[in-house]
């Protein structure tokens, strides 16, 4: 039987403690270094777009491309799916995003704008339902979801 668990700070810390009791090397390592705290991203749309941008390239290059991508939009306003749908795909390509990734980002924007992915209730869904919804978007696989 599989149990679905939402990975949060408490679950992660509990898991690390359990692993540490079974592995002295891990325990020593964790005593030396702090447990990483993963920030929780509330802008699901941008998080998914950013995941596509970062795929299969170095973090440094992806950060530069991501920053150039964001510069296409008004920095004072949260980028919306409508903004992405309105922008010409060539402009997206010109900041260093491949044609394929650009089309995936447009697909994500389309899914959010049509409420195929509803940001308002996504935090209430279990992991499997979120994965099912996200992977219904062309260009979003399990690893991205």
Each language-model region and where it sits:
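A short, structure-level motif marking secondary-structure boundaries and short turns
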Residues: 12, 34, 51, 73-74, ...
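Short, aromatic/basic-rich helix-turn unit that serves as a nucleic-acid recognition element
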Residues: 48-52, 56
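Alpha-helical ds-nucleic-acid-binding substructure associated with the helix-hairpin-helix region
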Residues: 25, 29, 57-58, 62-138
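Generic alpha-helix structural propensity
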Residues: 21, 44, 48, 60-64
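Intrinsically disordered, low-complexity, charged terminal extensions of DNA damage-control enzymes
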Residues: 1-44
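An alpha-helix initiation/capping motif
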Residues: 43, 47, 125-128
């Amino acid at each position: 039987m599989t149990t679905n668990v939402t990975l949060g700070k408490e679950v992660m810390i509990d898991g690390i403690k359990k692993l540490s009791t079974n592995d002295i090397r891990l325990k020593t390592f964790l005593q030396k270094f702090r447990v990483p705290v993963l920030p929780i991203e509330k802008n699901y749309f941008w998080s998914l777009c950013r995941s596509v941008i970062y795929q299969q390239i170095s973090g440094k290059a992806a950060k530069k491309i991501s920053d150039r991508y964001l510069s296409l939009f008004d920095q004072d306003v949260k980028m919306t799916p409508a903004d992405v749908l309105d922008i010409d795909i060539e402009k997206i390509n010109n900041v260093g995003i491949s044609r394929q990734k650009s089309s995936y980002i447009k697909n994500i924007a389309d899914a959010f704008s049509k409420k195929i992915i509803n940001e308002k209730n996504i935090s209430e869904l279990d992991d499997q339902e979120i994965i099912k919804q996200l992977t219904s978007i062309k260009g979003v696989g399990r690893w991205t979801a």
